[in-house]
Amino acid sequence: MKNIRNFSIIAHIDHGKSTLADRFIQYCGGLDLREMSTQVLDSMDIEKERGITIKAQTAALNYKARDGQVYQLNLIDTPGHVDFSYEVSRSLSACEGALLVVDASQGVEAQTVANCYTAIDLGVEVVPVLNKIDLPAADPERVEQEIEDIIGIDAVGAVQCSAKSGIGVEDVLEEIVAKIPAPTGDENAPLQAVIVDSWFDNYVGVVMLIRVKNGTIKLKDKVRFMSTKAETQVEQLGVFTPKSVQKQELKAGEVGFLITGVKELGQAKVGDTVTLVANPATEPLPGFQEVQSQVFAGLYPVESHDYEALRDALEKLQLNDASLKFEPEVSQALGFGFRCGFLGLLHLEIVQERLEREFDMDLITTAPTVVYEVVLKSGEKIEVENPSKLPDIGSIETILEPIITATILVPQEYVGNVMTLCNQKRGVQVNMQYMGRQVMLTYDLPMNEVVMDFFDKLKSTSRGYASLDYHFKEFQPSDLIKLDIMVNGEKVDALSLIVHRQSAVHKGRELASKMRELIPRQMFDIAVQAAIGSRIIARENVKALRKNVLAKCYGGDITRKKKLLEKQKAGKRRMKQVGNVEIPQSAFLAILQVSDK
């Protein structure tokens, strides 16, 4: 056991985490050259394209160190994006050490800081590594200083390497052996193994990635999941190198995969503890929590007969992504669809993109919303995640909205812009620290403001330099009202928004004029109105037009005219008729682009 090293890599998006992992695999001979592809551990196409890691993957590598001993290095790849912070904390809790990979030209960014603090809280040894030192813009001294100022760990003499060209990779491996402690644990104690990740395989069912903390797990053992009390039998054990290699047993300190008869991911929850039925552990390992959805959106198939196919696709995605929640929903405007819960905006985009790419679905997505707590005058408390479900204004005592604490790292010259943006979004400044050339701003922001377009605006006001990390803080009472959009006097439920009273009139006007541009002209005038309760606050008109398809028929047979008229009808089949008005997909997205004043 003293020759095992479990470690993960913490890095901001694009700082070279996956490339470094590739180099380790190549260096330790995990795959031969013809099997090497770039970013071996990022197995989903969308991971490679966006250059982000979503699911944790592992590789167990045998490394012959300079002292002549062979070490087993277990690399657990972590996601770097803020939406997946629970997955990160689970990956880190399975390790004794973490490599903090920082781009030597760009320096420290907010997500690196957040994940690094998570690591330090979990008592993980953090080893700084400067990557991309072969870039002309690299400035290792400045970045070492930044690591010390911002994160507060000693970075003098941090290992320098370039994962792309392979310089210094061996030094990094030596550093892992020297600095990261060996795992502790008792092979003879009752089994405790934490599930670091789980995914669905079409042939064997659920594959769990586990880290054995205490005890030993063998083939054919009967095991129990401690949070759900489900019991099952071990069918396969092994390690990834990153190819899977079968083993007879896994001992304390090792990381590997476990396949049982479980068919549903809901039973193998990330962070749960696995123990033996025959000799169970008394306590589960700490740190397990149910994942809460933060952002909700409606997903509707463009063709209503694709409803079942969409349900199928969502169920298949849920097999690989336990944090995706969904339930059926009916909208008068869009027909049948699903209300889905996500960890954050990136998660929403990824799910949407995977549905379109892997399952070939055509989707309409409504504007993302967050969960509000509504206290009724009767004293009852309800949760509302869909604006169209908000009870009547008369029966509401108060509405509470979720507040998040956001940490923003930004270069000094853009501080003013970012502060203005946060104030526009009803933010409250909590803290501001100068660290070298960077400034760390801490704000309490309403989550409702963040899900719309905060991230894009933050990037544009800071020319792409600001980086953001956030976590949920609490629910706070706020002056919120529901804004309805009416087309031809009928409410379009999918376009309702919950907004703050101050910005309601402005938002209503913006939306109405946006809708006027987007709704195609019809054979009759259309009124687009924005309303708060029964008060109309804005109105726009869409002028009428008519196309005459029979213009080219002089006399001739009636069937010819009928054919042309039928053809005209068929062309309108897909347009969703809302009070006989077709509302295109772009109109539902317009909500996202309404500016706030």
From Swiss-Prot:
GO biological process, one term: positive regulation of translation
Family: Belongs to the TRAFAC class translation factor GTPase superfamily. Classic translation factor GTPase family. LepA subfamily.
NCBIfam families: lepA, small_GTP
Alphabetized GO MF terms: GTP binding; GTPase activity; guanosine tetraphosphate binding; ribosome binding; translation elongation factor activity
Membrane topology: Peripheral membrane protein
Catalytic activity: GTP + H2O = GDP + phosphate + H(+)
Annotated compartments: Cell inner membrane
Protein's recorded name: Elongation factor 4
Pfam families in the cross-refs: EFG_C, GTP_EFTU, GTP_EFTU_D2, LepA_C
Domain tr-type G: 2-184
Gene symbol of the encoding locus: lepA
Amino acids binding GTP: D14, H15, G16, K17, S18, T19, N131, K132, I133, D134
Organism lineage: Bacteria, Pseudomonadati, Pseudomonadota, Betaproteobacteria, Neisseriales
Keywords assigned: Cell inner membrane, Cell membrane, GTP-binding, Hydrolase, Membrane, Nucleotide-binding, Protein biosynthesis
CDD domains per record: EF4_II, EF4_III, LepA, lepA_C
